[in-house]
Amino acid sequence: MGKLRIGFLTALLVLAGCREAATLTLADGEQQRLKDYRGEWLVVNYFAEWCAPCLRELPLLNELGQAAGPAVLAVSFDTMPAQALQAMQQRLAITIPVVTSLKGPWPFELPRVLPTTFVIDPDGKLAARHQGELRAEDIARWRENYWGNKGGS
């Protein structure tokens, strides 16, 4: 019975180690992992070119991405080749990295509403979700509650 239990536990550990990592692909083809952002706050925004509220909030996200604080990623809901996505990024003046795909176990589900923004804490866990257009006061509240004076990156 002891050997069977040890064998079972060993198999579980092996399978746990095989679990797919949370990864992303940027519009320029660069591959990254969620764990690359460990130790810092991460804001992940889902947008689409046809979504008017998404386009209105892009300047706020660009500004947030340039400020000291969280890393910011924009995930395109539009399915298009990388070259077209890069052209859209230039056309819309998106200065934050644009993601073409997310794979593996992310700490949130695919949004049902656009725009949707997720705040991921330095441990890789979901801290906040915002459905609908972001406003400056939403970001100010996150700054105060998450990555501002309370630590974080």
Regions found by a protein language model. Give the residues of each.
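Short active-site neighborhood of thiol/selenol oxidoreductases, capturing the structured segment around
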Residues: 34-55
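Structural microenvironment flanking redox-active thiols in thiol-disulfide oxidoreductases
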Residues: 56-92, 103-105
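Thiol-/selenol-based redox modules, centered on thioredoxin-like
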Residues: 116, 120-153
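Hydrophobic beta-strand anchors of alpha/beta hydrolase catalytic cores
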Residues: 43-44, 72, 117
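N-terminal "domain-start" segment that seeds a small globular fold
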Residues: 15-35
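Sec-dependent bacterial lipoprotein signal peptides
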Residues: 1-18
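Short, internal strand/loop/helix patches
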Residues: 88-122
